[in-house]
Amino acid sequence: EQQRYLNATKYIKLVIVADNVMVRKYTHNLIDIRKRIFEIVNILSLIYLSMNINVALVGVDIWTNGDKINVTSAVEPTLASFGTWRERDLLNRKTHDNAQLLTGINLNGDTVGYAYIGSMCMPKQSVGIVQDHGKTYHLVAVTMAHELGHNLGMDHDRDSCTCLANSCIMSATISPSYQFSDCSQNDHLRYLISHTPQCILNEPLRTDIVSPEVCGNYLLEEGEECDCGPLWNCQNPCCNAATCKLTPGAQCAEGLCCYQCRFIKAGNVCRPPRSECDIAESCTGQSAHCPTDRFHRNGQPCLNNHGYCYNGNCPIMLYQCIALFGAGTTVAEDVCFNYNLDGQGFFYCRRENDRIFPCAKEDVKCGRLYCKVYNDNVHPCRYQYLDNGMVDHGTKCAVGKVCSNRQCVDVNTP
């Protein structure tokens, strides 16, 4: 099952947001801004093909009437505000996997981009900021590829990392390279194994893609029946690479329910359950695509009552601690969670518009997560200071209660 997940083609449904400084920088010429974004995404897509990832632009949001958040040269608060806005506003308007803020502001120091690491599919953290630096779009595209790489679990390259170019995409300094290093590929693989983000398994609808249609870019767009890439590289006998139409007699060219150009018979499982909270999906016999992922109702007990189902998963603090600090880690003692009452530094429940709010006593297990590494009595309250160090939504925080919006609420609360 894990190998099947790792081998599957991934799809990142991307929204790019241009801030108001971008609007003024290009003298309110929205056509030029959209053209620049399309050019950036074309290169971004090309870069990620080597990772078996298709990047599809499904939305462009241009802040013509002023910024929706406080955009400043300080990257950390700006990224946090952008993530909050994405969760509360953008996701409610447009289904997507990741959002990148393209800003005309000069970011602090030599910084031209910033993103959370290992955060793909997370409502608040699957975001990045990219400065529109340089006259050509090539370096901006490489910068966005770098920040997206962080979201996909890649860290900065070390001196020992190599690729086919003099420098690689995840170099700590800006590089014109289109190549990922061996370290980046290993980082990404480890991230997929440990986090298995599910949203990137879903292929975008052809009607969702907003960039101009191109036959030969591996993305199924309006007017196409298939797209197996450029003519010189297509290896799919079911698809005519020159026309992006199915070959004679073919019902399909790809998909979890497509085999040798024909629909797989009804009843064959195409998506096994990933946890006891998930439900298996089967082919219908009428489509190449696996039906929409379904799961058991939120709030159903799981893992021997250690947790409650939430969107197909069973989030518990123990597994979150292991993901952060590795095997041999457990949840810290209850007293550690009282740090979340402070409302200072990294110890809080909520952060909004650069302000942090302490947890109420009953909500301390919905703020920062605290873990203990086996036999380490020197640091009994370990924590991760980034946003992925917060307790996950849907996690059990008390008997009959789960974390929702950083509050410990009744498990049956909508």
Curated annotation (Swiss-Prot):
Extent of motif D/ECD-tripeptide: 276-278
Binding of Ca(2+) 1, residues: V214, N217, E221, E224, D227
InterPro entries per record: ADAM_Cys-rich, Disintegrin_CS, Disintegrin_dom, Disintegrin_dom_sf, MetalloPept_cat_dom_sf, Peptidase_M12B, Reprolysin_adamalysin
EC number(s) given by UniProt: 3.4.24.-
Secreted in keyword set: yes
Coarse class of the protein's main subcellular location: secreted
GO biological process: apoptotic process; proteolysis
Keywords recorded for this protein, A-Z: Apoptosis, Calcium, Cell adhesion impairing toxin, Disulfide bond, Fibrinogenolytic toxin, Glycoprotein, Hemorrhagic toxin, Hemostasis impairing toxin, Hydrolase, Metal-binding, Metalloprotease, Protease, Secreted, Toxin, Zinc
Compartments, as annotated in UniProt: Secreted
Obligatory cofactor(s): Zn(2+)
Sequence positions that bind Ca(2+) 2: D278, E281, D293, R294
The family this protein is said to belong to: Belongs to the venom metalloproteinase (M12B) family. P-III subfamily. P-IIIa sub-subfamily.
Self-association state and partner proteins as the record states: Monomer.
Name the UniProt record assigns to this protein: Zinc metalloproteinase-disintegrin-like batroxstatin-3
